[in-house]
From Swiss-Prot:
SUPFAM superfamilies linked to this entry: GroES-like (SSF50129)
Cellular localization per UniProt: Cytoplasm
InterPro entries to which the protein is assigned, alphabetical: Chaperonin_GroES, Chaperonin_GroES_sf, Chaprnonin_Cpn10_CS, GroES-like_sf
Molecular function as annotated in GO: ATP binding; metal ion binding; protein folding chaperone; protein-folding chaperone binding; unfolded protein binding
Described purpose of this protein according to its UniProt entry: Together with the chaperonin GroEL, plays an essential role in assisting protein folding. The GroEL-GroES system forms a nano-cage that allows encapsulation of the non-native substrate proteins and provides a physical environment optimized to promote and accelerate protein folding. GroES binds to the apical surface of the GroEL ring, thereby capping the opening of the GroEL channel.
Listed HAMAP family: CH10 (MF_00580)
Protein name: Co-chaperonin GroES
GO cellular component, one term: cytoplasm
Lineage, opening ranks: Bacteria, Pseudomonadati, Verrucomicrobiota, Methylacidiphilae, Methylacidiphilales
Coiled-coil boundaries: none
Amino acid sequence: MVEPKIRPLGERVLVKLIEEQEVRKGGIIIPDTAKEKPQEATVIAVGPGKLDENGKRIPIEVKKGDKVLISKYGGTEVKIDGESFQILREDDILAIIEG
């Protein structure tokens, strides 16, 4: 994957979805109609954070390279150099996957 030349604004985050495997360990092929929309993603870039009512910048909790769980229907899909990414708000990130 080539690093996209895009910088999210405010409290937005650019992520690359981690696709669900098409073939399970037992050799069972999963058809596209049976796959759920992926909920795991890798953080590619983060915005500077949002401003509070006093004009102070509140930094985003995730950082580039973090693996995260995201809301199924949050964000906007974008294509950059033929690859699919999602831009979403920090609120659409449910958790950081550790370990």
